[in-house]
Swiss-Prot record:
The chain crosses the membrane at residues 44-64. Keywords: Acetylation, Endoplasmic reticulum, Membrane, Phosphoprotein, Transmembrane, Transmembrane helix. The gene is Arln. This is Sarcoplasmic/endoplasmic reticulum calcium ATPase regulator ARLN. It is a single-pass membrane protein. The keyword Transmembrane helix applies. Inhibits the activity of the calcium ATPases ATP2A2/SERCA2 and ATP2A3/SERCA3 by decreasing their apparent affinity for Ca(2+). The modification N-acetylmethionine is found at residue 1. The lineage of its organism: Eukaryota, Metazoa, Chordata, Craniata, Vertebrata. It comes from Rattus norvegicus (Rat). It holds the Pfam family ALN.
Length: 65
C-alpha cells in the first residue's frame, strides 16, 4: 500500500510541477500591446505643443510688457 501511495504522491508532485512550469512559461512571454496603445505620432504632437506653448509664454512674458 505504501508503494502505491508513494507512487501516486510523486505523480501528484510531477503534475503540480508541470502546471507551475506551464504557468511560469506563460508569465515569461512578452505581453503584446493591443490597439489601445499610444500611437507613435503622439510624441511628435507633444513636442510641437510644448514648443508652441514655450513660444507663446516667451511672447507674453518678455515682449508684451
Amino acid at each position: 500500500m505504501e508503494v502505491g501511495q508513494a507512487a501516486s504522491g510523486t505523480d501528484g508532485v510531477r503534475e503540480r510541477r508541470g502546471s507551475s512550469a506551464a504557468r511560469r512559461r506563460s508569465q515569461d512571454e512578452p505581453v503584446q500591446s493591443g490597439m489601445n496603445g499610444i500611437p507613435k505620432h503622439s510624441y511628435w504632437l507633444d513636442l510641437w505643443l510644448f514648443i508652441l506653448f514655450d513660444l507663446a509664454l516667451f511672447i507674453f512674458v518678455y515682449l508684451l510688457p
